[in-house]
């Protein structure tokens, strides 16, 4: 199968997976206690009012028909109006997506840099490498919410080093672009560190394992035979071969990153997509739930397809839609 055909097949499978997940979520939302009519009219509305809302919003149609109509409107850019915020869902999600991407990209880049460095350093240690890798595995097992609470209490509330809530200080609005950017970066330190710590430990473990495999290869033995220092071999030759494989792993971590972002945003009152989802769940805001989850699922599937493509590029024997995770 050609590369283009494999790519088209992977995209088609990704679209089918997205539609299946959206259909399941739509059915769950429609069958939730209270229903959309109660969410729109209010819990204390009379039955007559709820019935009128049901007719006005065509909520009495079959669920399958409602889903097809929802997907058709979504494809045209009409994601509906939030029941709770009374604003277009697309604009609301776009507004909250920027802080979430800032949090995720900052955490992912920090985790890759720190995890790669720690993993390579552990691989270069003849006797202490296994201990370092075990410590990284232990850190990876720590709950994100618990780590966040420790950092908030210690570095935030007790020592006062960093702010513990929000995206920025309202007093910095008129301070200029540079000062505002620094203020956002300062507020992002604890949320980014909380989200990055677990992923850095994961990348360190993966890097250590892959680096140890690389160090058994012939080119490493040849370099040692030529008298090249172990540090140069690890940070020069081995690091170059491990790097592309980490890119595949990073793309496949996007789903876990979103899950952690929801917890971190809730903990630090970070005004992102995760906090919006929490509010939508509490307030039974069905349009926001469907739109936000749909976007997250689409991004996760896209990153998975991209990981398959990168994996196939690294190893041409693997087709993009059949690449291993």
PLM region descriptions:
Residues 17-68, 159-181:
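Hydrophobic alpha-helical transmembrane segments of membrane transport/permease proteins
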């Amino acid at each position: 199968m050609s590369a283009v055909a494999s790519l088209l097949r992977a995209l088609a499978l990704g679209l089918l997976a997205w539609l299946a997940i959206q259909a399941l979520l739509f059915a769950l939302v429609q069958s939730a206690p209270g229903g959309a009519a109660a969410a729109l009219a209010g819990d204390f509305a009379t039955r007559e009012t709820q019935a009128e809302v049901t007719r006005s919003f065509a909520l009495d149609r079959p669920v399958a028909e409602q889903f097809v109509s929802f997907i058709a409107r979504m494809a045209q850019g009409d994601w509906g109006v939030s029941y709770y915020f009374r604003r277009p869902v697309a604009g609301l999600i776009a507004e909250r997506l920027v802080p979430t991407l800032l949090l995720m990209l900052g955490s992912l880049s920090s985790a890759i840099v720190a995890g790669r460095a720690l993993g390579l350093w552990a691989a270069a240690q003849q006797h202490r490498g296994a201990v370092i890798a075990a410590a990284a595995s232990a850190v990876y097992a720590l709950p994100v919410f618990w780590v966040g609470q420790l950092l908030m209490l210690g570095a935030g509330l007790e020592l006062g080093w960093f702010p513990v809530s929000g995206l920025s200080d309202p007093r910095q609005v008129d301070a200029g672009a540079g000062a505002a950017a620094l203020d956002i970066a300062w507020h992002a330190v604890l949320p980014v560190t909380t989200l990055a710590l677990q992923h850095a430990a994961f990348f360190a473990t993966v890097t250590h394992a892959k680096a140890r495999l690389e160090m058994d290869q012939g080119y490493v033995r040849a370099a040692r035979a030529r008298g090249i220092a172990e540090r140069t071999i690890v940070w020069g030759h081995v690091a170059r071969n491990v790097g592309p494989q980490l890119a595949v792993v990073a793309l496949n971590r996007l789903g876990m990153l979103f899950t952690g972002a929801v917890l971190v945003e809730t903990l630090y009152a970070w005004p992102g997509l995760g906090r919006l989802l929490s509010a939508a769940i509490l307030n039974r805001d069905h349009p926001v739930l469907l739109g936000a989850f749909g976007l997250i699922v689409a991004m996760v599937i896209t990153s998975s397809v991209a990981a398959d493509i990168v994996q196939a590029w690294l190893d041409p024997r693997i087709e993009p839609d059949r690449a291993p995770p």
